[in-house]
Every structure is written in structure tokens, then in C-alpha cells.
Amino acid sequence: MPPRELSEAESSPLRSPTPPPGRGSASPELGIKCVLVGDGAVGKSSLIVSYTCNGYPARYRPTALDTFSVQVLVDGAPVRIELWDTAGQEDLDRLRSLCYPDTDVFLACFSVVQPSSFQNITEKWLPEIRTHNPQAPVLLVGTQADLRDDVNVLIQLDQGGREGPVPQPQAQGLAEKIRACCYLECSALTQKNLKEVFDSAILSAIEHKARLEKKLNAKGVRTLSRCRWKKFFCFV
């Protein structure tokens, strides 16, 4: 069942779920900062709203810089993930770059039915990310996947003399070229692969933080195996 449509009042701001009584004090909460970047109107805000609220924004509202916070359980351990929704407009480049340095994982987003947004991944977004944060993992995310086979969208692309939807093999090839953790396509409207996108982001961030702590020889830090942390993700 697709998510219900949210009014503007419902979708902004988001409220953080309250942890169950006693769970928060049982074990320390791991914090993860996840930043979404990409051209304007590719659906970054919709991804966050659909994932955290099980709803879909009623209308497009350009974002300057919004933050959202939710708690999830990863193999029974509490994890707080901060989702940073950034603007794609050039006049906000300086503001956007301020949130990059301490980011644990990036979602580089493009719309599968906007070839120009795909091109800008290598021309704008990856260079911008790496200028301010050379090490954090990056996931390449194709958004609006529900429109890939939409007849009206295909007609509009053809009439406008533009290219068709971005082919999946081409996107996968780019992910390998830029050394992204993976390439995933999803839809905020239907929620297809939506959870997989954020699960993968959380896993990549956890492994990245573990590697950094290991390099710093922090006492008591153990390497987190992929299979252990991938077993279970759920909202608290």
C-alpha cells in the first residue's frame, strides 16, 4: 500500500519518535549523520518524509536546509540517524557545504527521469562532497523510479527533445566509477526499495565509523561485521 499523502503542515517539521521506556538507558545510542545531495526537485525531501512518516508531501516545497531525526534499531541496538535535506540551488552552495565535514554517509540523488540531474552527479555533487569530506561513504540513489515507465513522462521527454530515462546499467556503471558503496533505485511514492536505501546508508555509516575508530586505536572498539548489522533494521 502506498504511503498516504501528507499536508504541508504534517510533513514539516518531522517529530522524532520517542524511545520505549527504559530502552534508552540500557545501551548507548550510536549517532549517524546522513546528508542527501542532488539537484532541486529530484525528490530528496520526499524520500525523507516517506521513510520517516510513511507519507508523501502534498506539493513540492523547495528546501534551504532541513534536518530530521529518527531512532531505529539495528540488531537490537538503538541508532539515532540524522537526515539532512539540502538544497540543490546554486545560490545556497555555501550554506549547504557547511554540513559536509562531519557527515558519516552521503546519498547522492538524481531522478531517473531527469538525465541532467544524473550528469550533475559527476559534474557538481561528487566534487563538492569530496572537497569537504574526502572519506565518508557515498551511495548513488536513483529517485522517482515509479516514473521510469510512466507514459506521460516518456511523452514529455520525447516532445521536449530530451533523452529518455537514465538506463540502470549506466547508473550502475557510474556507481562503480565513482566508487560508491552501491547503486539503488527507489520511489518515495510507492516506497519500493526505500527502506533498502536507508538500511544501506546506516550500514555503510556504521562500518565507516568502525574503521575510523580502529585507525585511531580507540579502546574497546570492535570491528562490526556486515552480516551482524544487516540482520535487522526497524523503527523504535
Swiss-Prot record:
User: Which prosthetic group or cofactor does it need?
Assistant: Mg(2+)
Residue span of the signal peptide, if any? none
A Gene Ontology biological process noted in the UniProt record is: endocytosis
The protein's matches in InterPro entries, at most eight in alphabetical order, are given as: P-loop_NTPase (IPR027417), Small_GTP-bd (IPR005225), Small_GTPase (IPR001806), Small_GTPase_Rho (IPR003578)
Which residues are modified by lipidation (S-palmitoyl cysteine)?
C234
Q: Which domain of life is it from?
A: Eukaryota
Query: Any idea where this protein resides?
Result: Cell membrane; Endosome membrane
Major localisation? membrane
Residues reported in the UniProt entry to bind GTP: 38-45, 85-89, 143-146
Q: Where is this region: Disordered?
A: 1-27
Q: Name one GO molecular function term.
A: GTP binding
Q: What GO cellular component term, any one, is given?
A: endosome membrane
Q: Which Pfam families match?
A: Ras
Q: Which NCBIfam families does its entry note?
A: small_GTP (TIGR00231)
Subunit info here reads: Interacts with PAK2.
- What family is this? Belongs to the small GTPase superfamily. Rho family.
Protein name stated in the entry: Rho-related GTP-binding protein RhoV
**Gene from which this protein is expressed:** Rhov
